Amino acid sequence: MKIILIFGPQAVGKMTIGEKVGDAFDLPLLHNHVTLDAIWPYIGWNKDTFRLSDQIRMGIFEHVAKDDSHPGIIFTFVWAFDMQEDWGYIKTIKEIFNKESHNIYFVELAADLDERIRRNTTEYRLEKKPSKRNIEFSHAELTNSAEKHRLNSYENEVQEDKYLKLDVTSLTAEESSQKIIAWINNN
């Protein structure tokens, strides 16, 4: 079973790249906004939205982990490396997928802020993520989180056997996904 965790700052390309990697391995993609966008229209964008989203995600992970015939899952998310609770979140995911048959791949994406700001308003992103359609709010969230949190790791900070960090600033989603697919196939 392949568990592919794709993380990085907002608008780095996690969902688009994750879709292509998912197609290559015939794995479903649970991108960050699937659960968030199902909740926020009803209760707003607040702490409860994130709490409920996490409950749904963990329920999905537990179901997948128990099903030995399941091929796996791709999950995309933002990891704030300066927040201990995010490290705890990763620990919980690792505890759920703790069988020897579970292969967890950690893929970190990075891109410079100007490129992420450009990607933040692409037609495809706005089509797939309703909460990003308020461009002003989305831009503010992206830039504020970049100032407030460290959304990419330091060198050697992520201590996982199957870990790849990829700067996608000047790569297309296709080029990025091909590099990730090749890396997974060699691990």
Language-model segments: residues:
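Conserved substrate/cofactor phosphate-moiety recognition/catalytic segment
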Residues: E19-A65
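Conserved lysine of the Walker
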Residues: K14
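The conserved Walker
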Residues: Q10
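Small-molecule kinase domains that catalyze NTP-dependent phosphoryl transfer to phosphate-bearing small molecules
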Residues: T122, L126-E175
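Glycine-rich phosphate-binding loop used to anchor ATP phosphates in small-molecule kinases
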Residues: L52-E108
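Short, amphipathic alpha-helical "lid/cap" segments that border enzyme active or binding sites
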Residues: R57, F61, A173-I181
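Hydrophobic anchor at the beta1->P-loop junction of P-loop NTPases
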Residues: I6
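Conserved phosphate-donor/acceptor-positioning beta-strand/loop module used by diverse small-molecule
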Residues: N98-N120, L166
